[in-house]
Amino acid sequence: KSISLKPDYAEAYSNMGITFKDQGKLDEAIIASKKSTSLKPDHAEAYSNMGNILQNQGKLDEAIEAYKKSIMLDPNLANAHKNLSFALLNCGKYQEGFDEYEWRWKTDENLSKYRHFRQPEWNRETSLNGKTIFIWSEQGVGDTINWSSCLSYITTQAKHCILECQEKLVPLLKRSFPNVEVKAE
């Protein structure tokens, strides 16, 4: 209805794109998203939304470009950084992906999830050679499975790796990563 009242309402097209994406109508979602960015080329959130749609279509390179455009327009858009990290990590660009992933703590959904430990947090600049690293699940089961693909990157560097995850994933992850100590949350 918003678009019928104001055909040049870029935000409405961006929201329509999100709705189509959530309904699994990815072709319609990308059309709406592109309409939004054509109407308002400086709309950072629209480019971030477009990146999400492209990522759902499996078009990771295009998604990365959309997220980078979003970040260029609004360098503090935490969700764009977080989503860029997912695309980069899924492409195997671990260093850049992990750098962007730090932005997740600045997103609304993660502000209260940060856990504080006495041990120092690994900053990826410090060598893990001869050290133990503790990794904990901070998201759902699907994300834990997706992120487990990064364990091989970590285990090649650390002496010992401990993974805390959802109880139902313990048997699967123990079988998949016999060199990782897997514990239930």
Regions found by a protein language model. Name each.
Residues K1-E185:
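Alpha-helical solenoid repeat scaffolds of the TPR/TPR-like class and their adjacent stem/linker regions
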